[in-house]
């Protein structure tokens, strides 16, 4: 479902999780299996080549305290020009919840609820900034927010 939403999105997507190994890494593996690759990185991908898709769909960027992502500062400094890059997915943990401005992003996915809703509002606010969508046509100046929850049963 998350991957379907990413592929249907008409612009870049921000995915937030409080968990690295139980939240972001499984998403990264799914992205690499489906044709996404790390942004301008010479680092080893997370997946072995035999499991990766050969169809290129875009790049992803990770901002986390424990996962290293090359060129994160280069990408973030592009500001309004972010929409001209091949980055389709930006993944982040709490380190990306404050002090980060994402321009032209069309979707926010919050993978798990947080007991403090102000953190969730901070995450959503990374993509909804003053004039952050000014370079887009008027009909594309919106942000869809997905809040996921899990149930037992």
What are these regions (language model features)?
Residues 11, 18-23, 34, 66-68, ...:
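Short, solvent-exposed loop/turn segments at secondary-structure junctions
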Residues 41-94:
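Conserved helicase ATPase core of P-loop NTP-dependent helicases/translocases
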Residues 116-138, 145:
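Conserved SF2 helicase motif VI
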């Amino acid at each position: 479902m998350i991957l379907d939403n990413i592929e249907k999105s008409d612009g870049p997507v921000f995915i937030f999780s409080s968990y690295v190994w139980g939240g972001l890494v499984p998403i990264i593996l799914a992205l690499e299996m489906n044709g996404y690759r790390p942004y301008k990185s010479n680092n080893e991908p997370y997946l072995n080549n035999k499991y990766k898709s050969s169809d290129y769909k875009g790049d992803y960027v990770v901002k986390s305290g424990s996962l290293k992502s090359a060129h994160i500062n280069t990408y973030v400094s592009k500001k309004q020009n972010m929409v001209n890059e091949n980055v389709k997915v930006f993944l982040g943990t709490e380190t990306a919840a404050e002090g980060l401005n994402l321009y032209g992003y069309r979707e926010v996915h919050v993978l798990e609820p947080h007991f403090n809703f102000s953190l969730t509002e901070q995450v959503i606010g990374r993509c909804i900034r003053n004039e952050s969508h000014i370079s887009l046509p008027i009909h594309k100046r919106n942000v869809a927010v997905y809040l996921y929850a899990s149930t037992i049963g």
